[in-house]
């Protein structure tokens, strides 16, 4: 017999490496789709104004507003709406968790 002993060892754990790769790929996908602008941009083949703006030269003048907002709309309205919905949801959940119970007094004449 040989003096070399074979010990049983568990297989290497690759879960942390797989988790790191999955997080990296997920972050790359989210960044790619959040930073790419897919809407058609106004303008001509030389002057592109995808986020609105103005351009003026000797022969032409271009004025485009932002594609998401008109000239009279506020940019804070969606944020305020989200906060209002969250607040209403929390209010309803608080009311559901703490229902109003009638007050019972210890007075025998009041019951």
UniProtKB/Swiss-Prot annotation:
Q: Which InterPro entries match?
A: Plant_vir_prot
Membrane-crossing residue ranges in chain numbering: 17-37, 73-93
Compartment list:
Host endoplasmic reticulum membrane
- Provide a GO CC annotation, any one: host cell endoplasmic reticulum membrane
Q: Which residues lie on this side of the membrane: Lumenal?
A: 38-72
| Primary residence | host cell
Please list the residue ranges that the record places on the Cytoplasmic side of the membrane.
1-16, 94-111
A Gene Ontology annotation in the biological process aspect, one of them, is: transport of virus in host, cell to cell
The function of this protein is: Plays a role in viral cell-to-cell propagation, by facilitating genome transport to neighboring plant cells through plasmosdesmata,.
Fill in the misc note.
TGBp1, TGBp2 and TGBp3 seem to act together for cell-to-cell propagation. TGBp1 is the main movement protein that physically cross the plasmodesma with the viral genome. TGBp2 and TGBp3 would facilitate TGBp1 function.
Q: Which family does it belong to?
A: Belongs to the Tymovirales TGBp2 protein family.
Q: What is this protein called?
A: Movement protein TGB2
């Amino acid at each position: 017999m040989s003096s070399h002993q074979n010990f049983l060892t568990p297989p290497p754990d690759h879960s942390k490496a797989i988790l790191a790769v999955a997080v990296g790929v997920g972050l790359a996908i989210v960044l790619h789709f959040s930073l790419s602008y897919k809407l058609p941009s106004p303008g001509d083949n030389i002057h592109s104004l995808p986020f609105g703006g103005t351009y003026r030269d000797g022969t032409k003048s271009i004025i485009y507003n932002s594609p998401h907002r008109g000239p009279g709309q506020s940019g804070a309205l969606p944020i305020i709406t989200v906060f209002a919905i969250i607040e209403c949801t929390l209010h309803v959940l608080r009311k559901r968790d703490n229902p109003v119970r009638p007050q019972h007094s210890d007075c025998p004449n009041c019951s």
